[in-house]
Structures are given as structure tokens and as C-alpha cells.
């Protein structure tokens, strides 16, 4: 082998067993030969004349080398090209490699280097080409192509910035939603507190007006109980009155509360009215409810709402029970006996009275299932010829419609 591998595919394109350097004359055959070479993949010349000059197969295997047998001109076959774009520098290196190969051929191929140590100018290891006799063209690689990317270098930074902007936008929207919900809740609570304060102020004004009337009656010598009766007629709730007395130049923090009852005795009313007059004379009366009244009123409103909801549930349940009772009365109406000799009356309800079924009556007193004759007999009427004449169906009450 002399250190060179043998090209086993070199003779497929030629199709003969003759010596390598012998050129056999081309024989035109009427029948078209089977195309076995790779002319289609190598860009073969196929036009109107399909039996024209065929192209020699070029090997793309870099490990196949053949020793040149005789010096000859450079091969005239077409070289295998690469799909990568070629540059001017690669073309210049290719021409230089052809010149070097022409200079080395007379030496008998002793200076041939392994294919693994050389790369073609096109940048592909399979871009070397050889003719049908196994000659291979080798060129030195002078310039290399830079590896390119399908995405620009700064696209990752843009994506990261876009994701950060989206996350910030989501956080802003969430914060605004929470603030809006909190503001709605606070507005509702403020409105409720304001309404409670307005009601309390209105009640305090009414109490002050009643106290002024009572004081005027006391000064003019009128009947004091008349003002208390008027205060009772207004239907106002018990008023919490806190009085502060000046002792030793400072205000004492012990309030005195007077709560007149709606239905009290005359002695209690006479005891409370002079104390109120004394407060007005001293000028230290303050007709403002205590601070805890606000919390008490809020709790009362909450309990009232709960009672209303419970009442609504009870009403709905009663309505549903009324519907069930009405349906039961329509399906199983009540009956009773009438016109019996002993005058006894027994009540029951129809259990079966549909067409094709035997009528059954359930006795209320015992819960027995009886026929009409047995029901009349159970009432003490005995055996009668037509028991249905002694049984009356009670009408459904109008409240169940």
C-alpha cells in the first residue's frame, strides 16, 4: 500500500477495468445507460442532450489518498464547492495551493502530508476534490470564518429590561388595587361614623332644648313635671349627663350621671329635676354623650344587622316550609266524617286517591291506613251502603295558596 489508502470508489464513475492512464473511447449506445455517478448532486450538465459528456465523480472523503503514477497536468475536473460564502482571501489561497501542488508533483509525492494536518480553503473538511484516478487537491487554510449568531449580541439585555419593566408594572397595578380597596373600606367606615355622630348630635340638641324649657318653667314658677312629660313623649333614649364641679381651682374627673327612666315614679322625677336646675345655675353642665357611646352604638348597629339577616333566613325557611305544606295539602287533602248517627267526627287525610288505585285514608287519631268503609266504621257509623257520602274533603286554607 506504500503508506497510502486505496480509493475503492474511483472506478465507479469510469465503469472499466483497464489501466488507470488508459482512456477508452466513448461508445454511443442506443439504450441509455443507468446513471450511477453523483452528477445530479454535483451540478451535472443535463440539458437537451441527456447523453452528453458526463462528469467524473469527485470524492469527499479526506482520508483517501492515491500516489500519483505519472506526472500530468492539473486535473480538469470540477471541484466540490462548499455552501459557505467564499471570500477574496480564500480564492487567493486556493490559487497558491494549486501552484504548490504543481511544483511538488515531479518529486513522486514524497512530500505529501496527511489530510488530517491540512484544511481546504473553503473552511469545510469535505471540500477537497479529486479526479476519477484518485488525485486529490490540497490547499492550505489561510483565513478562518468567524462564527456568527442568529440573534444580536444585545438582545438578552433588551429581554431582561423588558421583563423588569413588566414586573414593575404588575407591582404598580397591584399596589393601586390594594390602595383603592383600602380607600373604599375607609370611606365606608367614615360615613358610618359620621352618620352616628350626626344622630348623636341631633339627640343632644333635642335634650338641650328640653332642658331649656324645663329651666324656663322653673324660673317662671310653672309646672316642672310638664317638661318631663314632654321629654317622655318625645320618645328619646336615656341621656347620659356628665357634670364637672370646680373644686380647689381644678376640674374633678369624677362625673355624676343622671339617667331618668321612661316609666319612673313621681319621686324620682322630682329628685332629678332640681338637680338639673342646679346644674344649669352653676353653668357646669355639659350635654355631650361619653366617648364609649360611639362604640356601643356601633355594636348595636352590628347586632341589629345580624338580627335582620337572621330574620330574613327564618322568613325564607318559613316560606319554604309553607310551600312544602301547600304541596302536601294539594297531594293529600284532609278529610273528616259527617252525617253519622252518633254525630262523631274523625279526621284523616287521603293517602291514595289516583285513578286506578284503591282509595286509602290515614286516620289521624291512630295513624292507620283504612278504606272508606273502614274509616266510616272506625268513626262509629257501622256498615253503610255508600261510605263516600259520609266523608267530606276539607278545602285548602287560603293562606296556603
Swiss-Prot record:
Native source organism of the sequence: Oryza sativa subsp. japonica (Rice)
Keyword Nucleotidyltransferase tagged: no
Pfam families referenced in this protein's UniProt entry, alphabetically: EAR, NLS_NINJA_AFP, TDBD
Gene: MODD
Consequence of gene disruption: No visible phenotype under normal growth conditions, but mutant plants exhibit increased abscisic acid (ABA) sensitivity and drought resistance.
Sequence ranges of Polar residues compositional bias: 217-226
Induction info: Induced by abscisic acid (ABA) and drought stress.
Keyword Nucleus: yes
GO BP: any one term: negative regulation of DNA-templated transcription
Function: Acts as a negative regulator of abscisic acid (ABA) signaling and drought tolerance. Mediates deactivation and degradation of BZIP46, a positive regulator of ABA signaling and drought stress tolerance. Represses BZIP46 activity via interaction with the TPR3-HDAC1 corepressor complex and down-regulation of the histone acetylation level at BZIP46 target genes. Promotes BZIP46 degradation via interaction with the U-box type ubiquitin E3 ligase PUB70.
Disordered as annotated region, ranges: 95-135, 215-238
Compartments in which it is found: Nucleus
GO cellular component assignments: nucleus
Protein name per Swiss-Prot or TrEMBL: Ninja-family protein MODD
Similarity section: Belongs to the Ninja family.
Keywords: Nucleus
Assembly notes: Interacts with BZIP46, TPR3 and PUB70.
UniProt biased composition (Low complexity): 105-130
Amino acid at each position: 500500500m506504500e503508506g497510502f489508502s486505496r480509493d475503492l470508489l474511483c472506478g465507479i464513475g469510469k465503469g472499466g477495468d483497464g489501466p488507470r492512464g488508459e482512456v477508452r473511447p466513448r461508445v454511443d449506445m442506443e439504450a441509455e445507460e443507468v446513471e450511477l455517478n453523483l452528477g445530479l448532486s454535483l451540478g451535472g450538465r443535463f440539458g437537451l442532450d441527456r447523453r452528453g459528456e458526463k462528469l467524473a465523480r469527485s470524492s469527499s472523503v479526506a482520508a483517501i489518498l492515491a500516489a500519483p503514477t505519472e506526472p500530468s497536468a492539473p486535473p480538469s475536473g470540477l471541484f466540490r464547492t462548499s455552501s459557505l460564502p467564499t471570500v477574496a482571501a480564500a480564492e487567493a489561497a486556493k490559487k497558491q495551493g494549486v501552484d504548490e501542488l504543481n511544483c511538488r508533483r515531479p518529486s513522486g509525492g514524497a512530500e505529501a502530508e496527511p489530510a488530517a494536518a491540512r484544511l481546504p480553503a473553503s473552511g469545510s473538511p469535505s471540500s477537497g476534490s479529486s479526479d476519477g484516478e484518485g488525485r486529490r487537491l490540497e490547499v492550505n487554510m489561510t483565513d478562518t470564518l468567524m462564527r456568527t449568531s442568529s440573534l444580536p449580541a444585545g438582545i438578552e439585555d433588551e429581554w431582561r429590561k423588558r421583563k423588569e419593566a413588566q414586573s414593575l408594572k404588575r407591582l404598580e397595578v397591584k399596589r393601586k388595587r390594594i390602595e383603592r380597596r383600602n380607600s373604599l373600606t375607609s370611606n365606608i367606615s367614615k360615613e358610618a361614623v359620621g352618620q352616628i355622630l350626626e344622630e348623636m348630635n341631633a339627640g343632644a340638641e333635642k335634650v338641650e332644648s328640653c332642658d331649656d324649657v324645663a329651666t324656663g318653667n322653673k324660673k317662671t314658677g310653672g309646672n316642672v313635671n310638664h317638661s318631663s312629660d314632654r321629654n317622655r313623649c318625645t320618645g328619646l333614649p336615656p341621656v347620659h349627663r356628665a357634670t364637672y364641679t370646680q373644686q380647689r381651682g381644678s376640674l374633678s374627673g369624677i362625673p355624676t350621671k343622671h339617667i331618668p327612666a321612661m316609666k319612673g315614679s313621681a319621686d324620682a322625677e322630682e329628685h332629678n329635676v332640681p338637680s338639673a336646675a342646679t346644674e344649669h345655675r352653676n353653668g357646669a353642665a355639659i350635654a355631650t354623650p361619653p366617648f364609649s357611646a360611639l362604640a356601643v352604638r356601633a355594636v348595636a348597629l352590628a347586632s341589629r344587622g345580624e338580627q335582620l339577616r337572621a330574620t330574613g333566613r327564618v322568613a325564607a325557611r318559613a316560606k319554604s316550609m309553607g310551600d312544602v305544606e301547600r304541596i302536601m295539602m294539594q297531594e293529600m287533602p284532609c278529610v273528616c266524617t259527617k252525617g253519622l248517627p252518633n254525630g262523631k267526627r274523625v279526621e284523616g287525610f287521603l293517602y291514595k286517591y289516583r285513578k286506578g288505585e284503591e282509595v286509602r285514608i290515614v286516620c289521624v287519631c291512630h295513624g292507620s291506613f283504612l278504606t272508606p268503609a273502614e274509616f266510616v266504621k272506625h268513626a262509629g257509623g257501622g256498615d253503610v251502603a255508600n261510605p263516600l257520602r259520609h266523608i267530606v274533603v276539607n278545602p285548602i286554607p287560603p293562606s296556603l295558596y
